[in-house]
């Protein structure tokens, strides 16, 4: 076994299909050039997590010590560790150092990237890095603790990178975008929320709407298929229209908020071809599709209402081991 190993995974934006993907609709998701890096170092006592964003947390190794109350921040990591142990990796005391360029609880896939990068670095420290398939299964154990009912879209994109058409239970399909001359602007409302709370709320509204909600889900699925064609054909105007329609459907199931709508309408009035929430909603981030010449205007338009805004580049590479 090596003394330490390091791995990273990308964040993501869901272009269309969040929430609907939980119940089997299609989602289109892209990995972005912001990554989260995890260094695992053996030694010390139990498990210690150090992160500039999440603070310092420690816990006994699973199965050792009294059943102490574990910090909720560490619980998903412990679920990943248990899953690794079930696959034959020995459980040793270690420190997990998380360095991230992805804001947490903002809909950009920070928790999935951390589960994936942790599982990859821990397995690599044992000299046997997980395959992409196993990485998905192990990281999903952590995501279930963090998210409740994850569709798997966040973990899949963190493992694979690129742009994917994702439907729960099916093999994801790589998309070759044909879009040129456009940029995706990401603006953070600065409002943090837990994905599991929003997912539960949206599902409860869908259930309360009964049969009517099946039409909303069906429309979301058709919209995502249209988005896939528009992205492949390079039809940015049509993709923008689809993003706006997707925002309406998400809003109809209670995923939006005043902060999100403010950013959406600011972007649209600054010339966005389309703008919508990305990720779970309520807070977190909004994405806007801009012609390259107009993205500066878009950035200016959101300054007052967002905690941070940036243009997102697509990351071809998914999870990877890092030298250090
Ligand atoms: C969160 O990034 C996406 C959701 O659809 C939840 C999920 O798919 O697991 C809201």
UniProtKB/Swiss-Prot annotation:
Q: Does the keyword Nucleotide-binding apply?
A: yes
What positions constitute the catalytic site? 154
Q: What class of enzyme is it?
A: transferase
Q: Which cofactor does it need?
A: Mg(2+)
Q: Which reaction does it catalyse?
A: (R)-mevalonate + ATP = (R)-5-phosphomevalonate + ADP + H(+)
Family (UniProt):
Belongs to the GHMP kinase family. Mevalonate kinase subfamily.
The subunit structure is: Homodimer.
Write down what this protein is called: Mevalonate kinase
* Taxon lineage: Archaea, Thermoproteota, Thermoprotei, Desulfurococcales, Desulfurococcaceae
């Amino acid at each position: 076994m090596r003394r330490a190993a390091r791995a990273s995974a990308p964040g993501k934006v869901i272009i269309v299909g969040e929430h609907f993907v939980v119940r089997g609709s299609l989602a289109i998701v892209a990995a972005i050039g912001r990554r989260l890096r995890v260094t695992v170092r053996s030694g010390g006592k139990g498990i210690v997590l150090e992160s500039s964003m999440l603070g310092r947390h420690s816990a006994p190794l699973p199965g050792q010590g009294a059943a102490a109350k574990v910090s909720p921040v560490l619980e998903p990591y412990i679920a990943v560790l248990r899953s690794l142990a079930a696959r034959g990796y020995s459980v040793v005391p270690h420190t997990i150092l998380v360095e991230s360029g992805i804001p947490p609880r903002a809909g950009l896939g920070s928790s999935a990237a951390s589960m994936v990068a942790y599982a990859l670095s821990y397995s690599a420290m044992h000299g046997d890095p997980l395959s992409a398939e196993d990485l998905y299964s192990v990281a999903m154990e952590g995501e279930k603790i963090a998210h409740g009912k994850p569709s798997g879209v966040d973990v899949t994109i963190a493992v694979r990178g690129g742009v994917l058409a994702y439907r729960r239970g099916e093999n994801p399909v790589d998309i070759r975008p044909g879009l040129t001359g456009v940029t995706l602007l990401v603006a953070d409302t600065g409002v943090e929320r837990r994905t599991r709370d929003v997912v539960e709320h949206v599902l409860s509204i869908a259930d309360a709407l009964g049969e009517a909600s099946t039409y909303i889900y069906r429309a979301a699925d058709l919209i995502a298929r249209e988005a896939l064609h528009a992205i492949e054909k390079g039809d940015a105007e049509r993709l923008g229209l689809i993003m706006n329609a997707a925002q309406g459907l998400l809003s109809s199931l209670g995923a939006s908020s005043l902060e999100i709508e403010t950013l959406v309408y600011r972007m649209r009035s600054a010339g966005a071809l389309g703008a919508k929430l990305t990720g779970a909603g309520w807070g977190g981030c909004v994405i806007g599709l801009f012609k390259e010449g107009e993205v500066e205007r878009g950035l200016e338009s959101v300054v007052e209402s967002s905690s941070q805004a940036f243009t997102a580049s697509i990351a071809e590479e998914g999870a990877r081991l890092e030298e250090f």
